[in-house]
């Protein structure tokens, strides 16, 4: 057993992720008896469980690029028969269903709470950890590789384009001047010192957008999302529904554009569905979530 798989087994029980917009997603999917659904980002299995509980003969194909998530979902959904639940490990952009068609497809984008809260993953600047940020730890490129090898201009563009960081140039300049960096907290401290004092103690930590940009770059999240959204409408049966939950404007912009641009789809949500106030109060990380739905047209 590989080290990654060993770690997956050890950490799977700790992979507790509260799914967002669950009621709205299940209602929007209009789940049918005997239907087959694709959960393209299974995580801990929260959304898949809700789908499986709808009818006793519903099937789910669950995929995730994070082996820890797959291990967790396998454990959390162990009470469902294997003929109703199939797992696939990998990037949803690389998935090929062959001749299989789905009654519905869902994806819950971005980084999960367990990934953020696991120190060894290196996603959070609040926890001292190696600069990793890989969702799929089988891939080679880490956040440290990017921080320590990109030019100042490349880093500034990355922080601006993927993190929407307005102070990207001065942050990149200080990073290049003081690198190499190998830990999350070291990098966060330099970022904080790179910005004017009024930005250091604001509502948003000055490292937030830089870390978002790094994470997106490490995992090629936006490229993968565009590829997935280009392919997945053809995986739907006629009248099948796709539901995508995004967490920041870069993701939502891509989802909005590609659902509208697909000749196979009819958009069902003129405006994105957002969490109700009670869900936001119970799960603060849900506040930025947006759900968009579209349906496969009749041919």
Swiss-Prot record:
GO terms for cellular component: cytoplasm. One of its GO terms (biological process) is rRNA base methylation. Keywords: Cytoplasm, Methyltransferase, rRNA processing, S-adenosyl-L-methionine, Transferase. The keyword DNA repair does not apply. The keyword Cell membrane does not apply. InterPro entries: RsmH, SAM-dep_MeTrfase_MraW_recog, SAM-dependent_MTases_sf. It is found in: Cytoplasm. NCBIfam families: 16S rRNA (cytosine(1402)-N(4))-methyltransferase RsmH (TIGR00006). HAMAP family: 16SrRNA_methyltr_H (MF_01007). This is Ribosomal RNA small subunit methyltransferase H. It comes from Gloeothece citriformis (strain PCC 7424) (Cyanothece sp. (strain PCC 7424)). The gene is rsmH.
